[in-house]
Structures are given as C-alpha cells and as structure tokens.
Amino acid sequence: VGVTFFIMPVSVMFPLMTLDHFSGDAFGMSLVEMLWAGGTLLGGAVMGMRGYKVNKVLLINAMYIVIGVCLMLSGLLSSGMFAVFCAFTAVTGVAGAVYNSSFIAVVQSNVDPAVLGRVLSVFFSLSLMPSAIGLLGTGFLAENVGITTTFVLAGVAIMAIGFGSFALPSMKSLDSS
C-alpha cells in the first residue's frame, strides 16, 4: 500500500513530464504511455513463461528499488534526454509487472483459497485510498516544487521502502521459494 501511495500519483504525471519538461507533443505522450504498457506486458510475459525459484518477497523489494531509481533518474534528466526518459519508462513498466505478479503469488500462497478473492478485493480497495491522497499531494507538490523534483522525491521514497523492506526478516519469510 505504501508504494502505491507514491507510484499511482506519479504515474499519471508522465504525460505532464513529457509536455512540460521535455517539450513533447501528443506523439511523445502516446509513446511514453505505450512504452509503459509495453514494459508491463513484457514483464508479465516473462513472469508468466515459467516458475522462477526466487524468493518473491525479495523480488518485490528489488522491483521497488528499480522503480524508484528509474523515477528518480527521470526527474534528474535534462530536457534533451527524452529518449532516456522513454527507456526508464519501459523499465518501470517491466518492474511494475514483476512486482505485481510476485505480490499476487505471495498472497495466493499465504491466504486460504476460500477467502482469497475477498482478501485481494479488500487489499486493492484499501490501496486505492492512499492513492487518492497521494494524487492530491503530488499535484500540489508538482505545482510548487516542479514536476522533475516530484519525480525525484517519489523515486527516493519508493527506493527507501524497497531498501527498508529488505531490513525486515519477517517480510522475507512470507515466501519460501
């Protein structure tokens, strides 16, 4: 839920980043959205191809760090580096899909199948509540400190959650892969 607080609000700002910081146009906005979606499809396909023998909780934490690094570096790019922004966007899409598929697998392996649907429903409903607050805060932040700084701050926060999660042994024990 904590990561969603930062990812969801920043994800809606990719078109604004394209227009304002990179002086892009409708094609650039479409390209960025397409790369995010393509990265998500690629990440989902890679995760769905076979079962990986890796601790999925560690994978989730690593993907937090990858997403955070990509967002932070996106905010540090000069206005002439749109192609690099596009690459970071695609990587963020891949990492998001790996995170989501790993998260679902961890939940499925730890929750009784009789209540799994309700647990996922409650989780996703609860995770959207802080996202709404994050959207309000991110809009205010972007208006007052700039969109690039907002990307940097969100990236740093997401990385901190990823690194912090590695420090919790109880998290690692949620998956025995």
Per-range role (PLM):
Residues F14-S177:
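C-terminal transmembrane bundle of multi-pass solute transporters/carriers
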Residues V1-P9, A90:
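Pair of pore-lining "gating" transmembrane helices in MFS-fold secondary transporters
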